[in-house]
Amino acid sequence: MKGLFVTIEGPEGSGKTTLIQSLLPYFEQKEQKVMATREPGGIAISEDIRTILHKQEYTMMEARTEALLYAAARRQHLVEKVMPALNDDYLVLCDRFIDSSLAYQGYARGLGMDKVFEINRFATEDCMPSLTIYLDIEPEVGLARIAKDAGREVNRLDMEDISFHKRVREGYLQVVERFSDRIVLVNADQPMEKLIEEVIQVIEDKLL
């Protein structure tokens, strides 16, 4: 890989999507080859899997099914979109990657981080981000943001109770500790302008 693979992680309502939308034009103006994408999704097959995963009526979905669907979507997205871009020397900004599975399915769903990590090692052939930025926020604050965003479609995970979202954050904090060599924790409970500045500095430090 010649490019730089940067993933943005965080609980629901942490501001990942808004952040990436702001980072994209900044790096384009710097004449950096840059691409934004998301998980699950980014390509047709993975977007179809995303639809299944997010359907509100699929509350009966079992945790292992959920974990495997995310891994399947990740595999196709990686080989079809991310890897070609990295090989073409792009800065790839990805909304979620493996760490989401570790926090949500591994920890919050109780499948075990090691088991979920092994599933994803198989799916990605050990491809890991060069840098991960974790946007940390209290679940109550993130969910309140979602409730105020009339344009955001509520998905199946949003409907989980507050205890689930608290476990997700606990899981993320464990992931940050486990992979401290590549993950930078950033406080997401601050004005977006300041958040953008802080994240740009982190990425540029890595680029240099």
Curated annotation (Swiss-Prot):
Q: What is its EC number?
A: 2.7.4.9
Q: Which residues bind ATP?
A: G10, P11, E12, G13, S14, G15, K16, T17
- One GO process term, biological-process aspect: dUDP biosynthetic process
Report the GO molecular function annotations.
ATP binding; dTMP kinase activity
Question: Which PROSITE patterns does this UniProt record tie to the protein?
Answer: THYMIDYLATE_KINASE (PS01331)
Family of the protein in this entry: Belongs to the thymidylate kinase family.
* Protein function: Phosphorylation of dTMP to form dTDP in both de novo and salvage pathways of dTTP synthesis.
What's the name of the protein?
A: Thymidylate kinase
Q: Which organism is it from?
A: Bacillus thuringiensis (strain Al Hakam)
Q: What is the lineage of its organism?
A: Bacteria, Bacillati, Bacillota, Bacilli, Bacillales
